[in-house]
């Protein structure tokens, strides 16, 4: 057979075999493109595990009309232009293969509007023909990539896809990992029309810890200790879990190099070697780590999916990570082995916590020296005491006749089952239901805010819902009260176009939230009833030690006459009957 140049369509499908392994591969490539474009908010709509549809909307810089066709061709990119750029890659993508490869095995629509362009344009491409059609479209600033019928023209590839649940779980994992690398970006993940994940932009340390708890679990956020080590051009930061609290599965092992998620053997070996002398049998290292170094020190162009890298100074990188993690673990194990007296529950004074002053570079994720509170609180618990679950009255003694006052000098010892804080003062030991406190405090605040009107937040993309699916005729909707709740909408062609919602409803299912809110208002709900309903969306699934301390302060200041969230425990030596 004679040697000949492969047709472009065939070359693209061969490239797709390397880049597009499954729906999650498509999601990874498209999300990375959006982040490279400067997006701060992404909405992902997935259908049937990604095999039917993958739609990703962002508010990034967009693509001008003249470059839409070029964007769907191979080796076309705005990220590098020379060999020197390839040596200093600062973006997540750089090869210019993703869109061309994806469009060769799917039906692809690319819609984009840069801020400087007056109108939006869309480009279509479908399968092997790769014929690109460009036409006008309606779209806000940013880009939408709509992928339908993945592998429709390659049946052999399609039959290797797993079940819908399995494929979506891979997509979910990709989004969680990327969300850990870009705290400043908001992510909304929907599957078959239902909201599955909502990660608001996390700018503050508190918000970042909330995202960490959402992704890795409240237990990780509670147990993990922060590490921050620098040596010349090398910078290692993130969170480590002490050996005795590490997991049996390796599902929380996240390593990022210059913002890029990695599964690199060199890095994994360094972490395992640092843990091995402390790690109990059948447990594996548990961590979220970020390694930063100059771009010219690392080659990311060694793996089709960019999961692996090659370091120019491999030995130095390995030894730096190994020694810094070993130092951190030595300190953590030393702290775990201490048995501090009850009068020294907190390693930091309140003044030190507020100022952030510490000489320990391996500070706890909660802001206090790692695990001092948990070790001490363990010695305070009677054997019969357990975290309350609904009707735990047989194990917990409540004392309504000796009303527990919020103004007493309570302090947090630890957090159990993600929502119960173990607190004590000079006389008492008790559980504080953080979810109840959080909701009550927010409800009280919302009651006051509703009088003046809530500040709504515009939706990245307006949501349309048929009037037939909403209660009552639109002409009878309580317009003024909806505005007071921060809702902005317009009626257009038998649809309500929702443009703005209050913050606590914006992150979930917008249509469901709008419908329920409208129902409440048409039933003339009182302000306090409305506030309680809105407050339930503000609660968290899990609370860190820092958050527990915050809500303890809020409870003392705002709900000083309420002890409903408390359940008292007997102190050691007291009668537990």
Curated annotation (Swiss-Prot):
Functionally, this protein is described as follows: This protein is involved in the repair of mismatches in DNA. It is required for dam-dependent methyl-directed DNA mismatch repair. May act as a 'molecular matchmaker', a protein that promotes the formation of a stable complex between two or more DNA-binding proteins in an ATP-dependent manner without itself being part of a final effector complex.
One Pfam entry for this protein is MutL_C
GO biological process terms held by the UniProt record: mismatch repair
- Gene Ontology CC: mismatch repair complex
- Protein known as: DNA mismatch repair protein MutL
Sorted keywords for this record are: DNA damage, DNA repair
Checking SUPFAM superfamilies in the record gives: ATPase domain of HSP90 chaperone/DNA topoisomerase II/histidine kinase (SSF55874), DNA mismatch repair protein MutL (SSF118116), Ribosomal protein S5 domain 2-like (SSF54211)
- Similarity comment text for this entry: Belongs to the DNA mismatch repair MutL/HexB family.
Q: Where is the composition biased (Polar residues)?
A: 340-358
Q: Where is this region: Disordered?
A: 340-368, 381-400
Any GO MF annotation of the entry: mismatched DNA binding
